[in-house]
Amino acid sequence: LSLHDALPISALVDAVVPAPDLALRRRALELALAESARLGLTGVHDAGVSLDTLRLMQSLADAGRLPIRVYAMADGDAAALDWLCASGLYTHPGGRLQMRAVKLYMDGALGSRGAALIEDYSDDAGNRGLLVTSQAQVEAAIAKAVRCNVQANTHAIGDRGNRIVLDAYERLLPEDDRAARRFRIEHAQIVAPEDLPRFAQLGVIASMQPIHATSDMPWAGARVGADRLRGAYAWQVLLGSGA
């Protein structure tokens, strides 16, 4: 919902809801970790951790109260990435917490028609989705990650979003060191067929979540049409290519 001037209704709520204090944030983190452990998880990847949240995680690890392993990713080109660049890749002495990656965002989601496509949405002529971060900003953050030896994990869902990220990785990663850097594309849901082999060629990890195939089943065909579905949720093709 939004007002006539396109101000999100949520902005009215955000303006009056107080920010969570340190005690509340710590309690929320403890509950999330405990629930993860209860469900049998031994480790998680937390995609987008601020420097303040990392400090909270460190305090729990220091006290021996981190019940599972946490692979934390810095929240974009912000304070946590700057800290990684200045201090080096981080691993807690206890071995259960590390930060050695940054999470970036290229485009939006498929269901809301925000995933960036090369051609129009099949059910929305004239709309090709959007880049939630400018191409220049994402490329600058990737270049920074390369300089700092930090793994870049970039959200890309549409075929245009994936192509932009693959192009940036190809251009910015040292050719003789690409696979060792273990750069990832998060989700890689809709990929142009000609771009599928590039994951293996560039040593890029396709970090895909099976639940997206089932959650998108009601609308994926309508959004992108039968032809583009050939490059969608392509686990078998990517595995066969060596990705």
Predicted features, each with a name:
Residues I190-A243:
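Active-site-adjacent C-terminal substructures of enzyme catalytic domains
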